[in-house]
């Protein structure tokens, strides 16, 4: 390969060309280290190969495996949102917690949970 190769685009994401393929695939929402290693194993690409060393055929193979076997990016975000919306429509406990913006998985809220609840609200006349 001579010169700088154009940016590889997989699942609608620009993959960085100077990184190892194992790391670069993790820029796609829904693909972590395990899935990236599994994809490269299916396509028979070494884990230490860099993106700019990939041929167009190899990039196409990776793209096909991801499209066929994995739920990524917009589809994954849509499905996650639909699952949360379904819980809220059911009116179950988890749905109510989502609706109220509180922790869903049983964490305490007396103290902590500031990230989920938002900034602390000042109470008038509450001074020692």
UniProtKB/Swiss-Prot annotation:
This protein's record includes keyword Transmembrane: no
InterPro entries: Rbsml_uS13_C, Ribosomal_uS13, Ribosomal_uS13-like_H2TH, Ribosomal_uS13_bac-type, Ribosomal_uS13_CS
PANTHER family xrefs: 30S RIBOSOMAL PROTEIN S13/40S RIBOSOMAL PROTEIN S18 (PTHR10871), SMALL RIBOSOMAL SUBUNIT PROTEIN US13M (PTHR10871:SF1)
Gene name in the database record: rpsM
Record's keyword terms, sorted: Ribonucleoprotein, Ribosomal protein, RNA-binding, rRNA-binding, tRNA-binding
Listed Gene3D superfamilies: 1.10.8.50, 30s ribosomal protein s13, domain 2
Family: Belongs to the universal ribosomal protein uS13 family.
Region of interest called Disordered, as start-end residue ranges on this chain: 105-128
GO cellular component, one term: small ribosomal subunit
Protein name as annotated: Small ribosomal subunit protein uS13
Biological role: Located at the top of the head of the 30S subunit, it contacts several helices of the 16S rRNA. In the 70S ribosome it contacts the 23S rRNA (bridge B1a) and protein L5 of the 50S subunit (bridge B1b), connecting the 2 subunits; these bridges are implicated in subunit movement. Contacts the tRNAs in the A and P-sites.
GO biological process, one term: translation
Gene Ontology MF terms: rRNA binding; structural constituent of ribosome; tRNA binding
NCBIfam families to which the protein is assigned, alphabetical: uS13_bact
Record-linked SUPFAM superfamilies: S13-like H2TH domain (SSF46946)
Subunit structure: Part of the 30S ribosomal subunit. Forms a loose heterodimer with protein S19. Forms two bridges to the 50S subunit in the 70S ribosome.
């Amino acid at each position: 390969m001579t010169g700088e190769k154009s940016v590889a685009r997989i699942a609608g994401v620009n993959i960085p060309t100077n990184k190892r393929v194992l790391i670069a695939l993790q820029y796609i929402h829904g693909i972590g280290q395990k899935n990236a290693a599994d994809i490269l194993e299916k396509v028979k690409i070494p884990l230490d190969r860099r993106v700019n060393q990939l041929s167009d055929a190899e990039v196409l193979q990776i793209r096909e495996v991801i499209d066929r076997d994995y739920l990524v990016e917009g589809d994954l975000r849509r499905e996650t949102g639909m699952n949360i919306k379904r819980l809220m429509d059911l009116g179950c406990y988890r749905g109510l917690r989502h609706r109220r913006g509180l922790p869903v998985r049983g964490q305490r809220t007396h103290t902590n949970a500031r990230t989920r609840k938002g900034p602390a609200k000042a109470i008038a006349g509450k001074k020692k």
